[in-house]
From Swiss-Prot:
Keywords: Hydrolase, Lipoprotein, Myristate. PANTHER family: ALPHA/BETA HYDROLASE DOMAIN-CONTAINING PROTEIN (PTHR12277), PROTEIN ABHD13 (PTHR12277:SF81). A lipid is attached at residue 2 (N-myristoyl glycine). Belongs to the AB hydrolase superfamily. Pfam families: Hydrolase_4 (PF12146). This is Putative alpha/beta hydrolase L404. Its EC number is 3.-.-.-. It comes from the Viruses. Gene3D superfamilies: alpha/beta hydrolase (3.40.50.1820). The keyword Lipoprotein applies. One of its GO terms (molecular function) is hydrolase activity. The keyword Hydrolase applies.
Length: 263
């Protein structure tokens, strides 16, 4: 499902190279997105603090038009809202919860803009504010769910907003550069520095990582778990699983453990 792609070389123009490798939005014809407007889902657009239009897709379970709980799903770097829609629709029905997914600046219907780290952070702010302000949802009923690149975006939001509800991280990383090389040489220009923020997060965190992940090594997930303040949710290290097939290996029961944490 369009996930985080590794950085294979670090040339002299290292910053430009990192930017190009981080953001790899798929090209999907604009009219395809019209199919995301259904009886159970709808596309909205909201504007970020920097004036960028952020596409948001709201998905409701077929048997529950007014769900009390919502997941905010932050996708990987090779995905957009269209490519994750089928997975999230199925997840919504099985969990009986609403789901919000959104595109980062430079992705999907926002593709005319240039993707940046700050643009990603602005985008999740818009998505969560949509639930808080438009729907008046209590933060305790919102669950952040990040995959690959989206884990760093999720952690940044939780860190800045003193988040208390449980969050889900699938294939998390310490930082972008350490996916390839754990060296102080590249740290001055590093991006999405998850490990630097995880120490200050107080909420429960559920981590999933494939033992055969050859894009983001499982040592990243284990280091993130070791650094958590709240270890009340056991991590799941999934055998015979890589980077691109992990979502299909996570069970509904494992995700429900997070959604029902406060029940």
């Amino acid at each position: 499902m369009g996930l985080f792609h590794s950085i294979f070389s670090l040339p002299s123009t290292i910053n430009d190279s990192i930017e190009k490798q981080i953001y790899m939005p798929p090209y999907i014809p604009r009219f395809y997105y019209e199919s995301l407007n259904t009886n159970y889902s709808k596309i909205f657009t909201r504007t970020s603090s920097n004036g960028d239009d952020i596409p948001i897709v709201q998905i409701r379970p077929k048997n529950n038009p007014f769900p009390q709980k919502y997941i905010v799903f932050s996708h990987g770097n090779g995905c957009d809202v269209y490519s994750v829609f089928s997975y999230l629709t199925n997840l919504s029905d099985k969990l009986d919860v609403g789901i919000i997914t959104y595109d980062y600046v430079g992705y999907g219907l926002s593709r005319d803009n240039i993707p940046t780290e700050q643009g990603c952070y602005d985008s999740i702010e818009v998505a969560v504010d949509f639930l808080l302000n438009d729907y008046g949802l209590d933060p305790k009923n919102i669950y952040l769910f990040g995959q690959s690149l989206g884990t760093g975006i999720t952690i940044d939001y939780a860190h800045k907003n003193n988040w208390n509800s449980p969050i889900i991280l699938v294939s998390p990383y310490k930082s972008i550069c350490t996916v390839v090389v754990d060296s102080c040489i590249v740290r001055p220009i590093d991006k999405f520095c998850t490990l630097n923020k995880i120490y200050q997060i107080k909420c429960p965190v559920k981590i999933f990582h494939g033992e055969n992940d050859n894009v983001i090594n499982i040592t990243h997930g284990k280091k993130i778990y070791d650094s958590l303040n709240d270890k009340s949710l056991e991590p799941v290290w999934i055998p015979n699983t890589g980077h691109n097939d992990i979502l299909d290996k996570i069970t509904i029961q494992q995700i429900r453990e997070v959604i029902d944490y406060f029940d």
